[in-house]
């Protein structure tokens, strides 16, 4: 029995779809060399780490704090959703669709 592999997360899955469509030779090479799983796992980890750092940094820069969350939860949710969306766009541009 093979040990259970860590599942590829959302970022890795998005990148997989991209390389299947737009980078066929690269995708096929990774399949032949049995390196696709490790590559996608690393993409997923790198993207998740970058996403977390971006969200944290943007929230600090924009004053989206735990105090705001306590004072005005609706405003906090709106601002955090906006920050997450912008961080997602950066990750997509810099890692996923690159």
Question: What label would you give each PLM region?
Answer:
Residues 18, 37-39, 97:
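Sequence-level detector for tyrosine residue identity
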